[in-house]
Amino acid sequence: MKEFPKNYNFIESEKKWQKIWQEKQIYAYDENIAKDETFVVDTPPPTVSGQLHIGHVYSYTQTDFIVRFQRMMGKNIFYPMGFDDNGLPTERLVEKQRQVKAYNMGREEFINICNEVVASEEEKFRSLFNQIALSVDWNLEYQTISPLSRKISQMSFLDLVKKGEVYRNNQPILWDPVDGTALAQADIEDKEKTSFMNYITFKTEANDEFTIATTRPELLPACVAVFYHPDDKRYQHLAGKFAVTPLFNVKVPLLADPLVQQDKGTGLVMCCTFGDQTDITWWKTHNLPLNTIITKKGTIDFPHEIGIDGLKIKEARAKIIDILKEQELFVKQEEITQTVKCAERSGAPLEVLTVPQWFVKTISHKDELLKRANELNWHPKNMKIRLDNWINAISWDWCISRQRYFGVPFPVWYSKRIGEEGKILYADISQLPVDPLKDLPIGYSKYEVEPDLDVMDTWATSSVSPQLSTWGISDEFAVNKDRHGKLFPMDLRPQAHEIIRTWAFYTILKAHLHQNTLPWKNIMVSGWCLAEDRSKMSKSKGNVLVPEKLLEQYGSDVIRYWSANSKLGADTAYSEDVMKNGKRLVNKLWNAAKFVSQHFDKLSDEDKKTNLIDVKEKITHEFDQWIINKLVELVNNATNELQNYEYANAMHLTEKFFWSVFCDNYLEISKTRAYDEENKNPSGQYSSVLTLYHVMQTLLKLFAPFMPHITEELYQILYSENSIHIKGNWINYGNLNYKIDAKQPERLLEILDHVRKFKAEKNLSIKAEVQLLEVSGIELSKELTSDLKNVTSAKEVKFKPTNDEIKVSILT
């Protein structure tokens, strides 16, 4: 055993161990070990999109608790770290940091700037993840924009093309006019906004007036029909007739359709191409013409004497209303609250434009995906309903093309050869990764092709995050077929609940389409980290907690302790009180270890090296045997909780045992025997010290997944030069159980509790001498009576056997 330092300096200790763990490759994955002996994690690649915050620490450490446990259980661990450094989130960060706009500069120049920013931001993540002691193997690191990742992502695309699960079509899509790109259904959020319902006068061809209601009068030039409900008796006379649009005098059909809400507005609604998804449905169902007037920049494209061409949406709306009023065609306006579909990233209200895009078939697989969700092991189980609800709500195929720069390009060109103009040309797998702006399809010259200028949705690459680590999509599309077969499907996907509809869903979809399987066996879903007042953290509120400051103040182990106190899946508020409890626990571990260590020289070297099971006969005292039984029970329960991903329960059980059973009671009760200064009870002393030795060692191992630095420091001082975190270092006491009457030691604790309360009420020191301790209702064994006398400082203990409850009389 090493000399015990006087104090614990967490800053020095944490830096020291983080360096040693990396140097000794404690967390290295061994590719030569079989799959069934390996625990494979699909680690969330953090999005390189802004400031690091305590939420990163919160969710990533919860995964690490499980990984460290699995490693100590003997599993070979595949625990990579990736960086999701391509796509719109990164582009927005770059534009903000460098005060540039992608569209105002050359594509290559902007990509170079993105690469510079990404490299700097990723280094910050690495530093933080090392500080909080994530036990990842950094040799397995990947970036979603790296050549290998681009190759895997393009393989995924080509495999889906081959399977007929991807198509390109010129159809209505959701468009973000701020970021200038198409979006998928999962990229939008519904926002409640104040708006106005505008009542406008239309006429029939016969000059009969009627009123329609709309929130978007600026779309009048795009009106292609007017609809009413087939059961609405008010408008049956309009069947088969035509309306004439105000201001523009365009003849459009009056049609019946059950999607019309009779009680909304006047029950008459114009169909424009396009205001919303209902317009799309009507356009398709009734084979209506396409009349697009909104540009990709969110302005009006409608040269007309009315003068709205080039105006922004809101400007055009106001002008149309003014002109309608001038011509007495505007009936009234009502303020309403409506749900508006907005871009999740930019916050901009979305438009529906018709632009050629790439799509992954999704709607046709909804039933299959619901079955997949049911096959998956959910932790916690109640998170499954979120995926079920999302799948049931899907109404669009997944649009995977984005009109941006910094992303994975489509391995696609379009032929300009005479006779095959527009033919889609795909890269050969041997060419991947390709950049169609620089590379060419086999057999074509640069004058014969037009490159696809779009890049893939960042989720199109993130959705193959398991495959980015396994280096393969399928047996046919693989960089390393053997590696892919050994690692896929994976064991665990940890992630936050807000991206179930994106990352979880898309990854399940891709694995299902590629290999007809789930991507992992288990999904572990974390909640949000909230501010102390339980509000969502945001820069605007000024309540974002920066990890670096907390690490300086408390250290990594304390922050991890706070994270471990949050149940999986629960949204948890940051708590200064919990942090202080964590700091108190670290100090108590140090002091308890320091106390027990002074007795370890009383043990033989052989017994120190021997497993508890093999020295159990040397633990002879009844109270020592009782705590060993309790310890075995704790190990079994904590192990079971961790195997079920209930790390918070495991932490709670361990902490409660440490404070209540070990520190508050066992240490105090066994202390006199451990010292045995007069050598009155050598077997009792040896039993006590051997018990202290193994209980402390076991507690360090139980705490190790949660608080890796303090446990490593103490373990190496007291027990071994090998890391506490090495593979196979968990506790297994099998069926170890001492045949004792457990009620006897528990009665001892009950009596002790009475004495402590008595002394506290009399303002006596806990060590104050007791002349006579008289106990009725039970009689303790000779060994336990001796312990009771020692711990209560009682000169004499008398027992009065009765059938009554325990009563304690104390004479001081």
Swiss-Prot record:
Its EC number is 6.1.1.9. Pfam families: Anticodon_1 (PF08264), tRNA-synt_1 (PF00133). PROSITE patterns: AA_TRNA_LIGASE_I (PS00178). ATP binds at K539. A motif ('HIGH' region) lies at residues 46-56. InterPro entries: aa-tRNA-synth_I_CS, aa-tRNA-synth_Ia, Anticodon_Ia_Val, M/V/L/I-tRNA-synth_anticd-bd, Rossmann-like_a/b/a_fold, tRNAsynth_Ia_anticodon-bd, Val/Leu/Ile-tRNA-synth_edit, Valine-tRNA_ligase_type_2. It catalyses: tRNA(Val) + L-valine + ATP = L-valyl-tRNA(Val) + AMP + diphosphate. GO terms for molecular function: aminoacyl-tRNA deacylase activity; ATP binding; valine-tRNA ligase activity. CDD domains: Anticodon_Ia_Val. One of its GO terms (biological process) is valyl-tRNA aminoacylation. GO terms for cellular component: cytosol. A motif ('KMSKS' region) lies at residues 536-540. Keywords: Aminoacyl-tRNA synthetase, ATP-binding, Cytoplasm, Ligase, Nucleotide-binding, Protein biosynthesis. It is found in: Cytoplasm. Monomer. Belongs to the class-I aminoacyl-tRNA synthetase family. ValS type 2 subfamily. ValRS has two distinct active sites: one for aminoacylation and one for editing. The misactivated threonine is translocated from the active site to the editing site. NCBIfam families: PRK13208.1, valS. Catalyzes the attachment of valine to tRNA(Val). As ValRS can inadvertently accommodate and process structurally similar amino acids such as threonine, to avoid such errors, it has a 'posttransfer' editing activity that hydrolyzes mischarged Thr-tRNA(Val) in a tRNA-dependent manner. This is Valine--tRNA ligase. It comes from Rickettsia bellii (strain RML369-C).
